[in-house]
């Protein structure tokens, strides 16, 4: 459950380390984002010589949340932290070429097959 001002870790090699959600996209007064939702983020911490720099405003898709996601069989998949993958503002394709950590199958429904194929583990 991600809302404005939430800090997230970045699960790709785009060069960002920590980002902050500044807007939940999809609806005029939408408050929360879950796994598979697109958010607007700003880079708060980045490594030198990365593809993005501190202060950049980009889109990202949420791939892991502490709140987790409920499956139709009643099971819940939760993670230790909140993480996202940074997207290109125009094409909504990932900026990074590698994904770190597991992602959930729910991304498959949300047109993020590129992230699924790059991820080391799909739960």
From Swiss-Prot:
GO terms for molecular function: large ribosomal subunit rRNA binding; structural constituent of ribosome. Gene3D superfamilies: Ribosomal protein L14. It comes from the Bacteria. Signal peptide: none annotated. GO terms for biological process: translation. One of its GO terms (cellular component) is cytosolic large ribosomal subunit. Keywords: Ribonucleoprotein, Ribosomal protein, RNA-binding, rRNA-binding. InterPro entries: Ribosomal_uL14, Ribosomal_uL14_bac-type, Ribosomal_uL14_CS, Ribosomal_uL14_sf. Belongs to the universal ribosomal protein uL14 family. Part of the 50S ribosomal subunit. Forms a cluster with proteins L3 and L19. In the 70S ribosome, L14 and L19 interact and together make contacts with the 16S rRNA in bridges B5 and B8. Binds to 23S rRNA. Forms part of two intersubunit bridges in the 70S ribosome. This is Large ribosomal subunit protein uL14.
